[in-house]
UniProtKB/Swiss-Prot annotation:
It comes from the Bacteria. It holds the Pfam family H2O2_YaaD. InterPro entries: YaaA. This is UPF0246 protein SSA_1395. It comes from Streptococcus sanguinis (strain SK36). NCBIfam families: PRK02101.1-4.
């Protein structure tokens, strides 16, 4: 079993530092390709100012040289979903659950354990980087599939941007989740609701040590409850009345 969550654009640059593991060959290849760009090229690629592109180029060089600051991924990312995940005061059982089951999908690092030390970076799968003539998604597909080859059940809190990196064979094992608000006359979904709910849902999984679908159906978190009438075998739907 694995639980997958995506990276986030927002970062907590004060997260506690950690010693990194040696980078994957794919990570090194991506960094080498990024390092071929000029400051102007990086500014255009990332759609940022030349001043920020200069800082980004220095960060890429530090990563290649092994001098970049690293922090556990779960603490480094600080988007809306992450801010709604319990990330401190873990019990021993909660820490073991995270280490065993939770993984983060990255366009630079691949599929990594949630507490893997990584460096701040901007790269995502929507960016038009080519490696050996392949898109980032195509470049990472084999490594992504290998990372989950032994997992029969995969709980995905990913967007389609990340899910489509995996082959169809792997995606068929995934169970996805949808979070809706019931406003009386209609069910509503938008990114803010979804991101907050994903974090709250993951917290419920961690604190309740959930490993099976039947356990998930019984969860009640942040006002959300499971709705079997809206769910399917590959998508579980939770609704909050507001």
């Amino acid at each position: 079993m694995k639980i997958l969550i995506p990276t986030a654009k927002e970062l907590n640059l004060t997260a506690p530092s950690a010693i990194p593991n040696p980078p994957l060959a794919q990570t090194q290849a991506v960094l080498d390709e990024l390092a071929t760009m000029s400051v102007a090229g990086l500014a255009s690629f990332y759609k940022i100012s030349p001043e920020r592109a200069e800082i980004e180029l220095q960060a890429i060089q530090a990563l290649r040289e092994g001098t970049a600051q690293h922090a556990p991924a779960l603490y480094l990312f600080d988007g809306l979903m992450y801010r709604h995940i319990k990330r401190q005061d873990y019990t021993k059982e909660e820490s073991q659950y995270i280490e065993k089951y939770l993984a983060i999908t990255s366009a630079l690092y691949g599929v990594i354990p949630a507490l893997e030390p990584i460096a701040p970076h901007r790269l995502d799968f929507m960016m038009p980087l080519k490696l050996d003539g392949k898109s980032l998604k195509a470049f990472w597909k084999e490594a992504y599939d290998q990372a989950l080859a032994e997992d029969e059940v995969i709980f995905s809190l990913l967007s389609s941007e990340f899910e489509t990196v995996f082959s169809k064979k792997i995606r068929q094992r995934m169970i996805g989740f949808k979070f809706l608000e019931d406003r009386g006359d209609k069910l509503k979904v938008h990114s803010t609701i979804s991101k907050k709910a994903r974090g709250e849902f993951l917290t419920a999984l961690i604190t309740n040590q959930v490993t099976e679908v039947e356990q998930m159906k019984k969860l009640n978190f942040a006002g959300f409850t499971y709705r079997p009438d809206l769910s399917s075998e590959q998508e579980m739907v939770y609704v909050k009345e507001v």
